UniProtKB/Swiss-Prot annotation:
It comes from Sus scrofa. GO terms for cellular component: extracellular space. GO terms for biological process: adaptive immune response; inflammatory response; innate immune response. This is Interleukin-17A. Glycans are attached at N53. The lineage of its organism: Eukaryota, Metazoa, Chordata, Craniata, Vertebrata.
Length: 153
């Protein structure tokens, strides 16, 4: 499994759980489970950070990002105070877009595609087992767009 796919999968699972809880969708519970409406309901929960299905194969060729009209490279974003500690982010390779001849065309712009994800941040810092949920904006790829042209009259 590629680093990007592994991080994406674990964050998608975490986001799904948070969405279910926030939406108030009932998940079957044992009769002894506390009610979330109870003011004594804990604000802290225990989470198993082991990722299921780590061996899921990647489904794209390794040169995928280089074949776009707006190619990118992946850069490692590492933060030991965050889970996942490594997030791979895209960086656009050109300011323009690549035409059919493989040349950069500056009549189009290569721009980053960003996605907000949820990560777990250690809190307080350096505590191995204490985290809080945090939103992070990451660049997941690049795309080609027409430039914004402003005419001065």
């Amino acid at each position: 499994m590629t680093p990007v796919r592994s991080s994406s999968l674990s964050l998608l699972l975490l986001l799904s759980l948070v969405a279910l809880v926030k939406a108030g969708i009932m998940i079957p519970q044992s009769p002894g489970c506390p009610k979330t409406e109870d003011k004594n309901f804990p604000q802290h929960v225990r989470v198993n950070l082991n990722i299921l299905n780590r061996s899921t194969p990647a489904r794209r060729p390794s040169d995928y990002s280089k074949r776009f009209t707006s190619p990118w490279t992946l850069q490692r974003n590492e933060d030991p105070e965050r889970y996942s500690s490594v997030i791979w982010e895209a960086k656009c390779s050109h300011s323009g877009c690549i035409n059919a001849e493989g040349k950069e065309d500056h009549h189009m712009n290569s721009v980053p595609i960003q996605q907000e994800i949820l990560v777990l941040r250690r809190e307080p810092r350096h505590c191995p087992n204490s985290f809080r949920l945090e939103k992070v904006m990451v660049t997941v790829g690049c795309t080609c767009v027409t430039p914004i042209v402003r005419h001065i009259s």
